[in-house]
Every structure is written in C-alpha cells, then in structure tokens.
C-alpha cells in the first residue's frame, strides 16, 4: 500500500514539474517572439535612416557633423540589436540623433518640400509607432514570463530547469516622449 502512495506522490511531482516546465516554455517563447517583432521594426528603422541621410546629404553640405552622428548612432544600434538590455540605450541615442537631423531638415525649405524627404519622414514616424507597440507587447510578455517564473510554486523549480529572468526593453526617461516630426 505504501509503495503505491510513493508512486502516486512521484507521479504527482512529475506532472507538476511538466506543467511548470511547459508553462515557462510557453511564456519564454512568447517573449522571444515578441522580441523578434521588435527586431523587425528596428531593422526597418535602421534601413530607413541611411536613405534619409543620403537624401539630405547634398543639401546639408556643412552639416556633416550631424549626419555623422546619425550614422554612428545607427551603427551602434545595429550592433546592439538582439540584446534588449543594450538595444534600449542604443536606440535612444539613435532617436536623439535622428531628431537632430529632422530638426535641421526643418531649416532647409528645399528639403521640407522634397517628396522623398516627406515620404521618409512619414515612414520613419510609422515605424516609430510600430516599435512602440511591439515594445509594449514584448515588455508585457516578459513581465508575464518573469512573474510566472517568480511565482510559487514555479519558483521552486524554475532556476533548476534553466529558466533565468528576461530583460525588459526599456528606454531612458529622456526618450519616453513621442518624437515630433513636421511633415510640411
């Protein structure tokens, strides 16, 4: 009789471990999928910026320092992609550099009237909005995973099953305001 009780307890523990493991895998996979959605939008942003720089380069001959800052920030952001902890600050620096460039574009009437510049500004704004939505979904997914991982009884098995914490995709406080792009 006690043999069957021990077997029953072992089966219950095994079933519990399987349930915890499968729940954590599902939550972690959702977070990884959400990050890949951010990655797609960041790549789109990284691809748009050289096009914008190329279009404005000729008209902004003596503003080379600004253009160089934008390209350097873009290259740093590309290098940080794939790592949420590094991507946040790198993308924030890219946002600052891009805002500086777009601010200078406003000073050049011929650029403000250029259809290519208008289209690139619009695409950049749309991409920024998509990044914001993807970042929110990712952070919600990571929060769900981390909460599940830290909740009882999963906390008893999560670390031993190889489930470490996931990083949120955060931006510095100075970058939390919406970018303003004038399309006139």
Residue ranges and their predicted role:
Residues 1-184:
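A helix-centric hydrophobic-segment signal that preferentially recognizes long
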């Amino acid at each position: 009789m006690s043999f069957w009780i021990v077997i029953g307890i072992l089966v219950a523990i095994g079933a519990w471990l399987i349930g915890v493991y499968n729940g954590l895998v599902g939550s972690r996979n959702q977070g990884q999928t959400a990050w890949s959605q951010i990655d797609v939008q960041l790549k789109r942003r990284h691809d748009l910026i050289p096009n914008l720089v190329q279009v404005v380069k000729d008209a902004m001959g003596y503003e080379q320092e600004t253009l160089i800052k934008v390209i350097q920030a873009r290259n740093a952001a590309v290098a940080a992609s794939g790592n949420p902890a590094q991507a946040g600050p790198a993308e924030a620096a890219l946002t600052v550099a891009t805002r500086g460039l777009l601010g200078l574009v406003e000073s050049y009437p011929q650029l403000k009237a250029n259809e290519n510049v208008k289209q690139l500004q619009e695409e950049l704004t749309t991409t920024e909005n998509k990044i914001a939505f993807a970042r929110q979904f990712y952070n919600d997914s990571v929060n769900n995973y981390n909460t599940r991982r830290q909740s009882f009884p999963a906390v008893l098995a999560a670390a031993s099953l190889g489930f470490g914490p996931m990083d949120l995709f955060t931006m510095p406080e100075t970058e939390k305001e919406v970018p303003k792009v004038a399309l006139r």
